Amino acid sequence: MSERKEKREALFPEITRRGLLKAGSALVTLPFVMSGKAMAAKTAAGTAQASAESAERVVQTCSTFDCGGKCDIRAHVADGVVTQITTRPDSALDPQMPVMRACVRGRSYRKFVYHPDRLKYPMKRVGKRGEGKFERISWEEATTLIADNLQRITAKYGPACRFVHNNTATSGGTFSGDKMMRRLLNLTGGYLEYYHSVSMGNTAAATPYTYGTAASGNSLDTLADTKLVILWGHNPTETIFGHTNHYFQQMKQNGTRFIVVDPRYSDTVASLADEWIPLLPATDNALMDAMMYVIVSENLHDKAFIERYTLGFDEASMPEGVPANESLVAYLMGDKDGQVKTPEWAEKITRVPAQTIRQLARDYANTKPAALIQGWGPQRHNCGERTARGSTLLATLTGNVGIKGGWAAGYGGCGNRKFAAGPEMPDNPVKESISIMNWVQAADDASKVTAEAGLKGADKLNSNIRILFSLAGNYLANQNPDLHQAVKVLEDESKIEFIVASDLYMTPSARYADLLLPETSFMERWNIGETWGTASYLILSEKLIEPEFERRSDYDWQREVAAKLGIEPQFSEGRTEQEWIEHIWEQTRLSMPDEQLSTFAELREKRQHLFKSKPYVAFEDNIRDPQNHPFPTPSGKIEIFSKRLYDMNNPEIPALSHYVPAHEGPEDALAKQFPLQLITWKGKNRANSTQYANPWLQEVQVQKLWINPMDAQQRGIRQGDSVRIHNQRGVCQVPAEVTQRIMPGVVAMQAGAWWQPDADGVDHGGCANVLSSARITPLAKGNSHQTMLVEVAKYESAV
């Protein structure tokens, strides 16, 4: 055994860490691994560790996996091994870069990187797709297989048969394998592109119909004077999105009141909320409608703001060519449908008491400034576009748009965000594109992918997807909704002829590859990390250690493929991975002269760059000077009523964003057979499905089904019982967590668990996507992962 391997294995003794990891939120401040000195006292290899301490270097870096925090990770490296992970000390915290301390995910990366189950060699499939049977091959054979199949299949079907899938595990860096794969394909004829973000695509598509742009969020430092924050389906305490928690905790200490609207009593409710308001999933618009009714009927709306800046509030402010009784006031008062949108009406739909609705509406309207901040979970329903726009109407009625301390709601992306340049991308000769939600259809039968279904740039697709690259992405057979339908297409080798996957582990999706390649971790490659949401800094993610076994970065093997296709000089431009990062940094520096970015050599010393952004309020100029800064809508105003949506003439896309019962929502006839609504949440121990394979993090939060005591009692379910969750699409079996932290009528599981089917197709991993729907949303052509009806039963083993 090599000295380096011996040292690495000594760092992971077979002891339980459950007692440490159960500390929950305290993990943010605890070290997760023993120090080198502590290990030296327990292991023989620790002697070598102690003697090498003088040669140890501590490098500031960040993960470029699928996490938006980009926290400060301090990697302790000695003799080519990461021996410890710490984080930025309190004494080094900067007011402009607050809470750069690594969370539980960041502190556990060492186990993830050095886990013995990581893929080690390139392999090709020898069994049926999905069986997980592979044999080891050389890199020469692997890159030849890719080059030969690209040439053969492209010659037969054309370049539009090639598809690079959603690759979440690498999306946190500016230089990733999926980006460079697209570059390679564009140099050889192009590929079928996709649009839509599974994370927030519905709200990003809907918000511009109110404001003309999706960038409706303020920088968080403008919220210091906010008196009331309503977090609507927003759970930053667990998702850890940049600096959000830091600012919210400061506001809490300074007296800001927090209300959380969520079916689940999340950690955000526990840590921030003065009040928790649970409501049935997919009924958000009914609650919003009733709030608007109270605000208007009690004369609490901001009349001057509405008169000056909006279109569609009442009949007098409607656009031309629209019949009577289509305005917001007419809808709320029931002038057209005969139903007044009272809190009593909404209570029957949402299960929120009428008096709670009244008080919530009054509090929001009477408190200035106030911020209604919607998370991205509610917009992942098939009614999510309406929910996103509904929040913008509430912000508009109360005049909380374009002011410091307010929030325009909707998508919430900050309009002054800055990004690194990224690698240059040649033009894609293939002009058609599909929604990411159409990929199964495009692989199964391209004729079904019509403009109505989301096809752009062409009247039809000329080919099914025949070549698919899944590079560090676990979407194919895990994160994809209606998983069994997707797997059925993947298993049919007459459909997709060649699937290439690269990953760190044998994920459920990797099992369906024809060629499986061992990927490098962020510690074994060069990159630049950038935060999501706040986007206040860039941080260098430097290669710290050499890859073990035969692991290679995507870019490394892509250069070999490019050489075999005769395009290596155009593809690489003669640059190594590190040289690409230097080039990207220089391009970023030139594109932002006002930022005065350091040279790359200086960056290697400083490690990060803090943007010099000033406090930013979305639509501040539009409100201050509407004459010279009209809203970028057709009317130049905030469009409460959207004539563009009205002209689509689709009842599922109302011109006024209001409540329409959701497919598979609580009012659907299917609820008689499947009476419980299932939702998922993003947990603190992984980002989507990334790091699921880390055993330390599995102990942080065991995969269970949350069920309310009332629903459990009706089904004879007790704490810890094995239960089966089922609907018309699949069956999932996990232990029950009987808790009042979930409202009656709703059950919940953490998202991102790996699919683990048995011989009968029953999932034992807790992957909710065996139950979720692939129905696309009507406007964005996006995902509706969260809209699920299920039934739950105690499982009695026959043994």
Region locations from a protein language model:
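Extended redox/cofactor-interaction regions of prokaryotic respiratory oxidoreductases
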Residues: 2-7, 177-261, 285-286, 348, ...
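Glycine-rich phosphate/diphosphate-binding loops that line cofactor/substrate pockets in enzymes
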Residues: 143-162, 219-228, 338, 358-371, ...
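Active-site phosphate/pyrophosphate-binding segments
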Residues: 324-443
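Long, well-ordered, tryptophan-enriched scaffold segments
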Residues: 266-367
